[in-house]
Amino acid sequence: SPAKPTMHPGSRTTSYIMKGVTNAHSNFEKAQRVNHWYTIAGIDVYTMKNNLSAIAIIGNSITDGRGTTDNAQNRWPDIMSEMLHLKHKITNQGVLNLGIGSNQVVVPGGIGTLAKDRYDRDILGQCGVKKVIIFEGVNDIGNTKSGNSETTARLLIESYQNMIKKAKARKLKVYLATITPFKGAGYYTYFHEACRQYVNDWIRSQ
């Protein structure tokens, strides 16, 4: 367990809290139900097989599961994992979801440690990772003042470059996703859209 108590408020999965010792045969009818996770920082699966690997995803609420159904496990990484297993018969790769709702890459604010600072721990520090998906940046743009959009674009690109460099140094394959459209959001302006397009143009050029 982690040194400090932790929680995942956006787990979209029910936890059952009871006093005393419980097991799979316990009656949970009187348990307190909350749609959060607590305490556990991570789970490793030990195996004697040597052909297993993982795909680690760093992202924000889009990856964390904002808008999905509680207990349905229908976040896009869940669906991706299911498609790999069922449709493509790839059963030796796991998908690790390291998304944090309201997380940001470089612009201070939001929830959790900035992606550029948690990348080593949350992505490179995971066991068995062979592929990395970077899908984050929209919150940085949305929380940038219009006059600072060029600076945010530059800092995002620099952070992406650094993440990619670190992954390639470990011989990991990297997929960098473009930033999704956000027209209609309260922070949408011409300047924010121009910033998104600039960053996406750079991503597509790589």
What are these regions (language model features)?
Residues S1-I58, T63-N71, H88:
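N-terminal secretory targeting modules
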Residues A54-G59, T63, Q93-G99, K130-E136, ...:
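Structural recognition of the beta-strand scaffold that forms the well-ordered cores
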Residues N51, T91, R170:
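Residue-level signal for beta-strand positions within conserved beta-sheet cores that form or flank
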Residues S15, D64, Q104-V106, G142:
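Basic, gly/Ser/Thr/Pro-rich low-complexity segments located predominantly at protein N termini
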Residues S61, M83, L98-G101, K166:
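Generic, well-ordered alpha-helical scaffold segments in large soluble proteins
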Residues N71, D78, E82, L86-H88, ...:
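Alpha-helical cap/lid subdomain in secreted, periplasmic
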Residues K89-V107:
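Short connector loops at secondary-structure junctions
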